[in-house]
Amino acid sequence: MKLLLHICCAPCANRPLADLKAQGHDVTGFWYNPNIHPFTEYRARRNTVRDYLQEIGVPLIEQNDYGLRPFVRAVAEDIPGRCVKCYEMRLFRAAEVAKAQGFDGFTSSLFISPYQKHDLMKEVAEKAAETFGVEFFYQDFRPLFRAGQDFAREHGFYKIGRAHV
């Protein structure tokens, strides 16, 4: 399957990428994260993703409009509902790009995190898939979380909150 993998950061993406490729999928990374701030954090994560995907030969589609203002507008009116807004912005864009660029489906590295609202993300991704007429490829990557963090540490990946200025 030709899959678009939305990527939040390299530490979360490395094991899903390896696993999806091992399953025989043709994977392309997708960077769109208007929720990340400050800009130094955004840049550090994006650059680590770029470098890693280039190193392993995986194509990357980047949407580099630093969308903090639209993100803040989207969540400011509904602070308790900010998670769903954040998931919607990223997963709906991933579905839209997947459909527009001829991918069979999409998924996200967010599904590796034990800290995210997994069921809510899945629900949002399914709505995005239905909206754009593209398959949401669901896989619970959480069992790979520790291995991904270990891999990131061993390879010196930038980790959240330690921006390189």
How does the language model describe each region?
Residues 1-144:
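ATP-dependent adenylation/nucleotidyltransferase module used to activate substrates
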Residues 74-81, 148-158:
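Short, surface-exposed amphipathic charged segments that create phosphate/polyanion-binding patches used
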Residues 163-165:
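Conserved small/polar residues in nucleotide/adenosyl-binding loops
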